[in-house]
UniProtKB/Swiss-Prot annotation:
Protein's name in the database: Outer membrane protein A
Signal peptide region: 1-21
A Gene Ontology cellular-component term: pore complex
Disulfide bonds: 315-327
Site feature: Part of salt bridge gating mechanism: 77, 163
Transmembrane segments: 27-37, 59-70, 74-82, 100-111, 116-124, 146-155, 160-167, 186-194
Sequence repeats: 205-206, 207-208, 209-210, 211-212
Membrane-protein topology: Multi-pass membrane protein
InterPro entries on file: Bact_OuterMem_StrucFunc, OMP/PagP_b-brl, OMP_bac, OmpA, OmpA-like, OMPA-like_CS, OmpA-like_sf, OmpA-like_TM_dom
Source organism of the structure: Klebsiella aerogenes
Length: 350
């Protein structure tokens, strides 16, 4: 009982401690182990006869195991153990006892360093016990016992780990059948290979598509070409000029494009009159271009009146009306601003 308590204490020590030598989450591993197997409580019970000779309680033990790592702290493990063959060399009892088993355990681990874990395994073992002796002959028995284990595991490389482990199993065999009912403790060294430990290539997010460029282009036409002085009706040569402009606008074809026609006048006349005249001239241009095929919802008119003169003060000293009309001709104009979005095409990287 004292030995059992010690074994449980060793197993529970797996929680005393912090980075992770355990395999990656949701991966498999497999390995083998070799060690020193010792049977305890090996007295011969059959027919009330005691063994009166040497009993070789310490034997070579071995095993194989495979497991599934759920997360850094929890895994499940299944394994096969050869617990050894224990000879009896007595006068009354002369024979051997051997045992092998399959076990299923939960493996609870906790990191100490980046490549070292301490762990415990808790579960059950299905064993087979065989005995052959001079009194009872050959017998065997099967059963289930709890299994406790504790140890440390060191990640030698990314894929290979080694472990040092002590395992304890109670009551292997039925004394009435195979003559003994020993306990077993095994100290072993194991090596395992972890599958699927490769680092996934980092996923490079595609570069965001560049924002479309806002394009603005302005076409300026002289009002004297489009209209007679002080008029808002297009002249034939003005229509020809707008036909050429329409061709250019059609070739541009900006995405989500729109156009605004701005009408300007000179400073001759009242401000209110010139504002009305600029609006009428801008609308005349819009109506013509819509008739040519530009969608009405993509073009608008705006009268600017006398604002933004391009002549500045160059005509301030001109007094004669005819000369002033000629001097201020650049101020009488129609500007068409076309705005839209242009997709930016980037070359793929080699």
């Amino acid at each position: 009982m004292k030995k059992t308590a010690i074994a449980i204490a060793v197993a529970l020590a797996g929680f005393a401690t912090v980075a992770q030598a355990a395999p990656k989450d949701n991966t498999w591993y497999a390995g083998g182990k070799l060690g020193w197997s010792q049977f305890h409580d090996t007295g011969w019970y059959n027919s009330n006869l005691n063994n009166n000779g040497p009993t070789h309680e310490s034997q070579l033990g071995a095993g194989a195991f495979g497991g599934y790592q759920v997360n850094p702290y929890l895994g499940f493990e299944m394994g096969y153990d050869w617990l050894g063959r224990m000879p009896y060399k007595g006068v009354k009892v002369n024979g051997a006892f051997s045992s092998q088993a399959v076990q299923l355990t939960a493996k609870l681990g906790y990191p100490i360093t980046d490549d070292l874990d301490i762990y415990t395994r808790l579960g059950g073992m299905v064993w087979r016990a065989d005995s052959s002796n001079s009194i009872a002959g050959d017998n065997h028995d099967t059963g289930v016992s709890p299994v406790f284990a504790g140890g440390v595991e060191w990640a030698m490389t990314r894929d290979i780990a080694t472990r040092l482990e002590y395992q304890w199993v109670n009551n292997i065999g039925d004394a009435g059948t195979v003559g003994v009912r020993p306990d077993n403790g095994m100290l072993s060294v194991g090596v395992s290979y972890r599958f699927g430990q490769e680092d996934n290539a980092p996923v490079v997010a595609p570069a965001p598509a560049p924002a479309p460029e806002v394009t603005t282009k302005t076409f300026t036409l002289k009002s004297d070409v489009l209209f007679n002085f002080n008029k808002a009706t297009l002249k034939p040569e003005g229509q020809q000029a707008l036909d050429q402009l329409y061709t250019q606008l059609s070739n541009m074809d900006p995405k989500d494009g729109s156009a605004v026609v701005l009408g300007y006048t000179d400073r001759i006349g009242s401000e209110q009159y010139n504002q009305k005249l600029s609006e009428k001239r801008a609308q005349s241009v819009v109506d013509y271009l819509v008739a040519k095929g530009i969608p009405a919802n993509k073009i608008s008119a705006r009268g600017m009146g006398e604002s933004d003169p391009v002549t500045g003060n160059t005509c301030d000293n001109v007094k004669a009306r005819a000369a002033l009309i000629d001097c201020l001709a650049p101020d009488r104009r129609v500007a068409i601003e076309v705005k839209g979005y242009k997709d930016v095409v980037t070359q793929p990287q080699a």
